[in-house]
Amino acid sequence: MVQLLNPDMVSAGPPGRTGHIAVSYENYVLVWGGYRENPGVASNTYFSGAELYIYSCISEKWYLKKNGNVSFPPGMSGSTAVVIDDALYVFGGYGYHGQGCTNLLFKFDLETFIWSAVEPEGVPPIPVDKMAGWQYNKKFYVFGGFGNPDTGPSHEFQFVFYHLLWRGWTNQFFEYDPKKNTWSKPFTTGTLPSARAAHAAAVMQGKVYIFGGRHDVHRMNDMHCLDMEIMHWSGELPIKGPVPMGRSWHSLTALSERYLVLYGGFSQNNIVLSDCWRFDTVNHTWQPIELPFEKPRLWHCACLSIFDEVLIFGGCTTNILDLERTPEQATDIVVIRTYPKSLFRSCVDKTIDFPCNIWETLPHNIQSVLQLRFGYRSRHLIGS
């Protein structure tokens, strides 16, 4: 049993933000970090590292947990995060007390709701943001990112320097083992993807798929695969048929044992995208998905819910590079379903419209769900 969610923690939801992290955990989606644009102000506001927003897929409510102790990460954007054994690990990002990128690692215990700084042994990745991260066999993997020139021990990876910002793109690949508390560079075969940032990755059937991202002045549309069992890179996968346009700041979500869902991003021509594609990992084909809405998003986050829905939160809805206009940031949740909402959930939605005093005529399990939706009782983060 993990930390109790109190009725007092019910929230209207996170403010609009960009560059945050979001991960699935049991029946929940955890949202942390990111920043917001301030109209008419040259600087951005980074959200407090003490705040963790929790979205319940069952009650369809937001909860806010503010960390009361003095130990919590600084507000950052472009971090990456995974959940391993009831702990949220957050790595890297930008905005650390105005010092640019960081390679710090933090842990949030999901049973005690306490943050702690992790100090692993071994040589860490160079400080970056906008990298991709994933969990496999209870280890944390990090690939790529946009960061500071390497000033530490020699690394064997590509670094493409961007002189205007004194930073650059990298294809560094590192593994963090929580049991050993060590960083290491896994031995791999095959051809690594080129240096990139603002790409996306998804794990499926023992393989991780990496799509797109920015490399120098190019926003790419290549797909790469790493077999996590034998640590072999595929090189760029040959694709049959149409391919999504090149992009960065998009999301890629494993939907089943076969398909990945790509959503949104930022095009080569600085257009905020709202298209959705499904990638078949068996046949290596892309198929566009027609959605009943058009909601442009970039630098958003996407998670798979317990109901096999892709939940997309946050991100910019307008050109993030337009200096004459403050970018607009989304506060709603975009839901992508590959099949209709279940009859049970639809009935619950309809039943809520009826007076509460007739709920007593319903079975107890349905009453419990309705009470969760209305917030009448305290709640636990229950295992799925």
Q: Model segments located where?
A:
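Glycine-centered tight turns/hairpins at beta-strand boundaries that repeat
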Residues: 11, 25-45, 67, 84-100, ...
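Beta-propeller blade signature
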Residues: 47-61, 102-114, 155-181, 221-232, ...
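Alpha-helical interaction elements in eukaryotic regulators
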Residues: 14, 48, 101, 111, ...
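Cullin-RING E3 adaptor/co-adaptor recruitment helices
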Residues: 3-4, 36, 301, 306-384
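Short glycine/serine/proline-enriched coil/turn segments at secondary-structure junctions
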Residues: 72-73, 97-99, 124-125, 192-193, ...
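Conserved short beta-strand element of beta-propeller blades
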Residues: 13-31, 52, 74-90, 105, ...
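A structural motif specific to WD40 beta-propellers
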Residues: 5, 63-65, 116-118, 184-186, ...
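A short helix->beta-strand "capping" segment at the edge of beta-propeller domains
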Residues: 1-13, 64-66
